[in-house]
């Protein structure tokens, strides 16, 4: 949700953003409903004021023993008109809210303008692409050869894009989680295991409704949705709160399973564990002062880069274009890991600054002193590790000639000093 002052004072800023994002949005309708909303607020306030005045006059007349029939008629007329205005105002507010909650976020000036991922900008690379003197396998074949994943039985009990992790891949998955939590705890992140389901108002605060309804699972006959990431729950964690400025920044490390419909995935991604409906993820989430949020954004990215350097996974950092990044983000970096079996880089991290967009929707503010005005806080989020995708990268990049998988050195202590699968 954008600052309403922009609609009134700088609508061209929003028009420029919509053009850069190539988004079809009824901005004129939003501006018009905002103007009408303001007008109705003034009108209803005037009628409420008059109603209170009449109420006082009635009390005085009754106390003085005077006739109140005429003024009671006026009270009846004013109350009826007020009820009519409030009904109209409710309709206008509903239209305004629907549009205000779907307009995308502003875009940082450094973001490349383009229609899709072809306009993304490579910022840097790390690590050497592994070279093999033998025919390599992708993770799907390796999973079958080493009995690490059972896709057929998962499809039987749950459908496509589910899986059973088995044997040492279960341990490797858990080692990634434990290493990630230790890594963030050392950097003074507070560890959080959130609810795996949240209500609609919380989900709408964290994500644009049209977007989440396409990818998030709804719990039937309940006001609950399965989280697609712990970001959703952590964004809503401080909803309707005023945070003390001295406590900022707040850095959370969220650990949770994630549930996504992943509609539209095709090709090789329909098999294996790269693109699935359920996976484990460790997420960075930060509440920051407005003046600090861009610094925090770069810091979160650096934390994620360091994590993959420790895992010795070759990767690159991409700055997403206006056509490829999410609507709630003002700027997004992706980290893409090298997948040897696919001979390409694939996304494993998304790191975004949402400015005050989520905070306005969720009513999260901060203040420095008790008697000072409050400000909307800035929220930022970044994947640290979505384990199934990183398992794919490890399986493909660390495979050996005899068909085994070398365990990254930093994870060996989490697996009883085991060196290979």
From Swiss-Prot:
Its main location: cytoplasm. InterPro entries: aa-tRNA-synt_IIb, aa-tRNA-synth_II, aa-tRNA-synth_II/BPL/LPL, Ser-tRNA-ligase_type_1, Ser-tRNA-synth_1_N, SerRS_1_N_sf, SerRS_core, tRNA-bd_arm. Keywords: Aminoacyl-tRNA synthetase, ATP-binding, Cytoplasm, Ligase, Nucleotide-binding, Protein biosynthesis. ATP binds at residues 260-262, 276, 347-350. Pathway: Aminoacyl-tRNA biosynthesis; selenocysteinyl-tRNA(Sec) biosynthesis; L-seryl-tRNA(Sec) from L-serine and tRNA(Sec): step 1/1. L-serine binds at residues 229-231, 283, 383. GO terms for biological process: selenocysteine biosynthetic process; seryl-tRNA aminoacylation. It comes from the Archaea. It catalyses: tRNA(Ser) + L-serine + ATP = L-seryl-tRNA(Ser) + AMP + diphosphate + H(+); tRNA(Sec) + L-serine + ATP = L-seryl-tRNA(Sec) + AMP + diphosphate + H(+). Pfam families: Seryl_tRNA_N, tRNA-synt_2b. GO terms for molecular function: ATP binding; serine-tRNA ligase activity; tRNA binding. It is an enzyme of class 6 (ligase). It is found in: Cytoplasm. CDD domains: SerRS_core. One of its GO terms (cellular component) is cytosol. Its EC number is 6.1.1.11. Catalyzes the attachment of serine to tRNA(Ser). Is also able to aminoacylate tRNA(Sec) with serine, to form the misacylated tRNA L-seryl-tRNA(Sec), which will be further converted into selenocysteinyl-tRNA(Sec). Consists of two distinct domains, a catalytic core and a N-terminal extension that is involved in tRNA binding. NCBIfam families: serS. Homodimer. The tRNA molecule binds across the dimer. Belongs to the class-II aminoacyl-tRNA synthetase family. Type-1 seryl-tRNA synthetase subfamily. This is Serine--tRNA ligase. The lineage of its organism: Archaea, Nitrososphaerota, Nitrososphaeria, Nitrosopumilales, Nitrosopumilaceae.
